[in-house]
Amino acid sequence: MEILNEPPPNPAGGETLIVDAKDSSAYERPSAALKHAGPDDQIFIRPGIYEDKIFIADRPILLIGAGRDAVQIFCRRGGPLYLQNVPSGRIMGITFRYVGSDQNSAMNILDSTCTISGCRATEGLLSGVVIYGPNCRPTLIDNEVCHNRESGIFVFAEARPYITQNRCFANHHFGLAARDPGTHPDFVRNTCHDNMLSGILMFHHAEALVLENVCRDNRHWGFVTTPECATTPPRGEL
């Protein structure tokens, strides 16, 4: 992935706050910049490894990293990224890594509607990315979700995200998973490979749009669904 040397233009028209632990004129950690950012401000994270915990609630977010191979945010005391009721915005170009011993995910998304692209979620003791809540409609595009102890991306509790062109691999359970009545993700053009169980799982009354996904080299099966689940197109046409 391309590494950004300079922040992109702020689409909201506000200021751009710089995070760089090696520059005394910049913010030392992303969470410090977030405390000072207005609703139209953008945060740009220069290359580096940052120990931090980012919690964003009830506000838009523009959080841009120099690239997922250049910027890592890790946390020992919980997941490094929590979004709650985030109405809009974008997060891109960052690796989120959980390094603790409790049951946490690398990305936790509750009832939010932002876009997450070009990121990496790794080493969660639960799934790498959990997406949940009846008002949860984020877009995840071109992310890597890997080396998590459960599934890569887990959608539940009536969430309806758009999940496209992500690569989910080397997770202990499934690449993509959906559960619960009212849950209805769009799984479009994702690649799930080398997961220890199957590529995609749907269970307990979940529904999903399932189009042009690739499931290969998983330990068990490519796509698994329990009988009460519904897919578009129907199972027999997948």
PLM features: residue spans?
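Histidine/lysine/aspartate-rich catalytic loop segments that bind and position anionic ligands
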Residues: C136, C146, E158-Y162, F169
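All-beta strand scaffolds that present successive hydrophobic residues in beta-strands
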Residues: I45, L62-G65, G89-G93, C114-S117, ...
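Extracellular beta-strand-rich solenoid/capping regions of secreted or surface-exposed proteins
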Residues: S31, H36-P39, E51-I64, Q72-S112, ...
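Acidic Gly/Asp/Thr-rich repetitive segments characteristic of extracellular carbohydrate-active
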Residues: E15-E51
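Short aromatic-glycine-(Arg/Gly/Cys) micro-motifs in beta-strand/loop hairpins
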Residues: E2-D20
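Short glycine/acidic-rich loop motifs that flank beta-strands on beta-rich extracellular proteins
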Residues: Y50-I56, R68, F74-P80, G100-A106, ...
